């Protein structure tokens, strides 16, 4: 028996072009690697000595953007901005955690607060969270957003929709279309990002509320905590969801076993769904999301408690039936909003994933090939800001907001 160690592309060429490969030849395929890599960007000591499940799952080689790019602060007068949606004419619709939506125009001027939004519970991590425009926004002007809503025995993540008035001063007919289960007396881990799929259904991330009593519900299919859900524009479970006909599960659930997912986006070329979530102390994750899959929290994790205590007895990082993250960070990235880049403005960034980092104070650029991370870069790290969301504009520019109230615009020089 002969062993041939090849890259996947070389092996494919051989198989297609040669009929003389000896029998009983074993191909050992090496993963695709990004050219022109440098040392990994993470140089700090990890919180744990846990080993990755496969090569390239963490601390991948670094990359550096060759194209000259520039950035500017459009405004520093926002108040705890959380989510960004791109309107026409260079305008951005931005949520502020305390409960307001505002429009920032191309000159960086900020509108008055848009009237008509429901009240939010803005304590700690709660408030007005992510937002997304209806795929037919140009004709129906409908906006969807997530927020923390107070209830009788605590609060919960909710989803609302409304119609932005033509004068852009009010949200008309605003109404709540979905409320997560298990209202809880806490103020952490709400999730709160939204994205539409190609069929016009809405995917929403929901956190597990952090506490020991609620984190286990990430594994409970009768609870919406620690889940990614998929609903219609009216807040009903999408008809072809994986648990649509399962009486022992909530029909809106799409995937489960999540901790606090604050980033979600579709790959622009292959249509795959990706999500990023906060781990505990270490173990922030980037996951490839598939229906009915279990992403493991709190059973498996690459992190530890903030106290330094291990999670689980014994602690484990892998278990049959639970998905491994495509990539994880230790120390943490604190991943919030994220977007895949089209390549319109800076071609070398095409299909790269950009993730806003909070405690890490940078934007992570990830190069992804064949659903594997093959390169990582840190952008705007010298700004020392807590980046909360990042989106692509209509002309290939990137916009990002920070907890301190800044709105940045990143463009090709």
Question: Model-derived features: where do they sit?
Answer:
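Surface-exposed loop and turn segments in beta-propeller and other repeat-based domains
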Residues: 112-126, 174-190, 233-254, 298-330
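Acidic, Gly/Ser/Thr-rich repeat motifs that build Ca2+-stabilized beta-propeller blades
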Residues: 30-205, 211-212, 263-266, 272-275, ...
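Acidic/polar, solvent-exposed loop segments in beta-strand-rich repeat domains
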Residues: 212-223
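Short loop/turn segments immediately following beta-strands, especially the blade-tip
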Residues: 105-106, 162-169, 229-239, 289-296, ...
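Positively charged n-region of N-terminal signal peptides that target proteins for export
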Residues: 1-4
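Bacterial Sec-dependent signal peptides at the C-terminal "C-region" and cleavage site
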Residues: 10-27, 31-35
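Conserved blade-ending motifs and adjacent loop-strand segments that build the rim/top face
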Residues: 258, 373-394
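Repeat-solenoid scaffold signature
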Residues: 249-288
């Amino acid at each position: 028996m002969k062993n041939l160690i090849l890259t996947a592309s070389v092996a494919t060429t051989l198989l297609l072009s040669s009929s003389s490969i000896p029998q009983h030849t074993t191909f050992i395929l090496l993963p695709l690697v990004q050219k022109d890599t440098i040392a990994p960007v993470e140089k700090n000591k990890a919180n744990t000595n846990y080993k990755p499940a496969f090569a390239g799952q963490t601390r991948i080689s670094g990359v550096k953007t060759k194209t000259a790019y520039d950035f500017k602060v459009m405004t520093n007068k926002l108040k705890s901005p959380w989510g960004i949606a791109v309107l026409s004419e260079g305008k951005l619709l931005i949520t502020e955690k305390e409960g307001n939506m505002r429009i920032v125009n191309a000159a960086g001027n900020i509108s008055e607060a848009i009237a008509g939004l429901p009240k939010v519970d803005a304590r700690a991590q709660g408030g007005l969270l992510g937002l997304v425009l209806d795929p037919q926004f140009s004709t129906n002007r409908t906006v969807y957003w997530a927020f923390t809503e107070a209830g009788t025995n605590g609060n919960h993540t909710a989803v609302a929709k409304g119609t932005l008035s033509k004068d852009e001063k009010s949200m008309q007919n605003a109404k709540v279309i979905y409320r997560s289960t298990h209202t809880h007396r806490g103020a952490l881990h709400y999730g709160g990002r939204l994205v539409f799929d190609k069929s016009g259904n809405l995917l929403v991330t929901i956190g597990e509320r952090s506490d020991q009593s609620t984190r286990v519900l990430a594994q409970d299919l009768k609870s919406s905590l620690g889940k990614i859900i998929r609903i219609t524009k009216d807040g009903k479970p999408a008809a072809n969801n994986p648990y649509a006909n399962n009486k022992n599960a909530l029909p809106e659930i799409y995937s489960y076993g999540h901790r606090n997912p604050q980033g979600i986006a579709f790959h622009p070329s292959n249509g795959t769904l990706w999500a990023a979530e906060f781990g505990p102390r270490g173990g922030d994750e980037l996951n490839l999301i598939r229906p009915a899959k279990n992403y493991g929290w709190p059973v498996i994790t690459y992190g530890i408690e903030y106290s330094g205590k291990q999670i689980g007895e014994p602690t484990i990082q892998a278990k049959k039936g639970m998905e491994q993250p495509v990539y994880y960070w230790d120390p943490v990235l604190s991943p919030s909003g994220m977007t895949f880049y089209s390549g319109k403005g800076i071609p070398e960034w095409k299909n790269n994933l950009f993730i806003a980092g909070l405690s890490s104070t940078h934007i992570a650029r990830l190069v992804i090939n064949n659903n594997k991370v093959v390169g990582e870069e840190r952008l705007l790290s010298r700004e020392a800001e807590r980046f909360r969301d990042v989106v692509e504009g209509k002309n290939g520019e990137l916009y990002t907001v920070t907890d301190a109230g800044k709105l940045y615009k990143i463009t090709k020089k």
